Amino acid sequence: MTEKEELLEAYRKELHNIATARDPLAAEKAMCKARVYVGELKHNHKLGEKDVSDMYETVDVFLWRANRRMSEGI
């Protein structure tokens, strides 16, 4: 597995961690890690701006959904 594939897998894992977080702190921690992985992909593997923007937006949406789910007690 290449470094790029490992970073993408770690990014997906953090998205899962955001989605399954039981408290806001855990979701924020996973969000920060996911953003670091996106940054590494951007700088070390020359990911395109559109791809990077989409990945950041995905992280934000996952966090928003997790916070909404937790606030509604679902």
Where are these regions (language model features)?
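Short, charge-rich amphipathic interface segments used for partner binding and complex assembly
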Residues: K29-R68
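Short acidic DE-rich linear segments
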Residues: M70-I74
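N-terminal acidic leader/helix
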Residues: M1-K29, R35, W64, R68-R69
